[in-house]
């Protein structure tokens, strides 16, 4: 809108009436290239207010109109069934065939894009889609963006090779990464991927848990030694710690005297195959443990202890699914405890709040808070069979419909109708660092349609798609969540399992179901076979020969 490059942090100037009229990103203390110093900017703004106030008023009006235009997506009724295929081909064409991920630098994980490509492979059988996903995961999991000592992924890579990260660790990135890696592992059974899920979720519980059960937001990039200082190594440090074993470790993790980042070494395994022999991996595990213990003596980066509903929703979903897929009760318990924490301390008169910090919950929830927590509730239902999670999801959908829906143009606003101090209410389906709330709502509404049999949820999902059909038709990769959800709505797959959830045969059926890495698939497990409404997926079904039974349904 202002004709300058985006970035962060955002610096905006507002009128006394709180209307934005000009802004930028970072302004240095001294002029740098074509960027003025911050004091020069302040001086210019002061001059405008004193001598050219009309220009500020004109700019504010123009910016307001531009924001309103951006907040009004092109409307085109729905998406034809064949659109998913053409969209997936377009996304595949912009993937990096050498290093994986979207082309160029900096490189972000872009998990919704990877999920869409995986979905395209499961639908079409074209191996190019699968290969694009596995290539990206291999490079991310072996690159410097991954913390090879402590587990967990950094925010993004500053280069196209996934080597040098921006060292900040975000809860939402790690939740999304473990979700896609778990999905791919269900198909490939690659032990390397299992290791990365295990290390990352163990890191999440170890370093991101807050008292009571929720998860903190981030771990900063900066530590007292500067950005990344906590994570990088000089060769002589490793030689001192590992002694005669250092040569083997240095080859495995790309360590050299000159370093690969500002004279020091970011550990990575990009030059080696994912896993060596079991004996060699055991040796490396011992070496990593020694370095991890030594690193713990350094002053660590600061943790942002805020508990955010939306990011916790993503973490809960990943932990719940991975806990079931890998049979890890600790992860499953962590998912349930975090969900209970949100419901216990972050609800006010039945409505979600966005943030909890230092014992206080505050700030009105956004669409993303509800969408991700509904997704979390449904993930917990799928993995536990506890129907109270479905009830909670339905309650939250009702709140969204009452306070967030755009009754004129369809879809959901990012903020509720009773929020204050906003110059406009935005409504978008674009993914950013996290999936789009509207795209996620299509997915969860489609899931609710499958698990309840109530067509009203399918209709609501279709209405959201109708609201953003024109945007999706432009082919932006940032609409991956919405387009993936459209395919789920048009090709729903529901596996209904009847039997004792703790019984050996039922567990075997659940395990076989999770071996099918189908993004469109919803799994429901029922022990209670009491009468249900005619449209309910359990209606008319019973165990065959008194044995646990699975029904595959296409609603």
Feature annotation, model-predicted:
Residues 206-209, 344-371, 378-531:
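Long, polar/charge-rich, low-hydrophobicity segments
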Residues 120-124, 184-192, 322-329, 380-387, ...:
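Inter-helical turn/loop segments and adjacent helix faces that build the functional surface
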Residues 319, 334-336, 376-377:
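Glycine-rich phosphate/oxyanion-binding loops and their immediately adjacent helices
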Residues 1-318, 322-325, 353, 465-555:
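Replace the tail clause
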Residues 193, 331, 361-364:
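Catalytic nucleophile-loop/oxyanion-hole region of alpha/beta-hydrolase
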Residues 139-146, 337-345:
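Glycine-rich, acidic and aromatic/proline-enriched surface loops and short helix-turn segments
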């Amino acid at each position: 809108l202002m004709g300058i490059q985006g970035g962060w942090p955002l610096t905006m100037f507002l009128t006394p009436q709180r209307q934005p009229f000009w802004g930028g990103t970072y302004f240095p203390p001294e002029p740098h290239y074509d960027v003025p110093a911050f004091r020069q900017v302040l001086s210019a703004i002061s001059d405008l207010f004193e001598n050219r106030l009309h220009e500020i008023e004109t700019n504010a009006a123009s910016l307001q109109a531009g924001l309103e235009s951006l907040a009004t997506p092109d409307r085109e009724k729905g998406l034809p069934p064949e659109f998913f295929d053409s969209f997936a081909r377009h996304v595949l064409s912009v993937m990096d065939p050498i290093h994986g991920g979207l082309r160029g630098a900096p490189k972000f994980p872009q998990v919704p894009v990877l999920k869409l490509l995986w979905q395209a492979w499961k639908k079409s059988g074209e191996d190019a889609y699968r290969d694009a996903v596995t290539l990206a995961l291999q490079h991310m999991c072996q690159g410097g963006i991954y913390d090879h000592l402590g587990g967990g992924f950094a925010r993004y890579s500053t280069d196209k090779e996934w080597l040098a990260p921006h060292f900040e660790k975000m809860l939402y990135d790690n939740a999304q990464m473990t979700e896609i890696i778990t999905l791919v592992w269900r198909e490939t059974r690659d032990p390397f991927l299992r290791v990365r899920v295990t290390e990352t979720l163990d890191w999440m519980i170890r370093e991101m848990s807050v008292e009571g059960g929720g998860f903190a937001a981030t771990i900063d990039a900066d530590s007292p030694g500067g950005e990344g200082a906590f994570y990088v190594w000089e060769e002589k440090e490793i030689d001192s710690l590992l002694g005669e074993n250092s040569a083997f470790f240095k080859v495995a993790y790309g360590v050299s005297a000159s370093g690969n980042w500002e004279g020091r070494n970011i550990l990575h395994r990009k030059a080696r195959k994912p896993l060596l022999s079991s004996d060699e991996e055991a040796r490396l595990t011992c070496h990593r443990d020694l370095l991890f213990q030594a690193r713990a003596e350094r002053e660590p980066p600061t943790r942002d202890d805020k508990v955010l509903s939306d990011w916790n929703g993503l973490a809960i979903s990943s932990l719940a699914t991975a806990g079931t897929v890998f049979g890890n009760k600790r992860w499953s318990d962590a998912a349930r405890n975090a969900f209970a924490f949100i419901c216990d301390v972050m609800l006010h008169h039945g409505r979600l709040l966005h943030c909890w910090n230092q014992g206080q919950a505050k700030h009105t929830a956004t669409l993303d808070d509800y969408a991700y927590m509904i997704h979390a509730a449904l993930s917990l239902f799928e993995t536990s069979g506890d129907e109270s999670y479905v009830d909670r999801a339905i309650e939250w959908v009702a709140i969204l419909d009452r306070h967030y829906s755009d009754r004129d143009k369809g879809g959901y606003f990012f903020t509720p109708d009773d929020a204050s101090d906003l110059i406009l209410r935005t409504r978008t389906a674009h993914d950013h660092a996290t999936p789009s709330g509207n795209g996620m709502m299509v997915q969860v509404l489609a899931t609710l349609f499958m698990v309840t049999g109530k067509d009203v949820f399918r209709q609501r999902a279709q209405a959201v798609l109708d609201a953003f059909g024109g945007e999706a038709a432009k082919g932006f990769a940032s609409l991956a969540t919405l387009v993936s959800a459209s395919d789920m709505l048009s090709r729903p797959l529901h596996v209904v399992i009847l039997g004792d959830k703790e019984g050996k045969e039922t567990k075997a059926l659940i395990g076989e179901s999770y071996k099918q890495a189908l993004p469109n698939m919803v799994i429901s497990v029922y022990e209670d076979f009491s009468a249900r409404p005619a449209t309910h997926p359990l209606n008319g079904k019973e165990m065959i020969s008194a044995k646990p039974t699975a029904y595959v349904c296409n609603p």
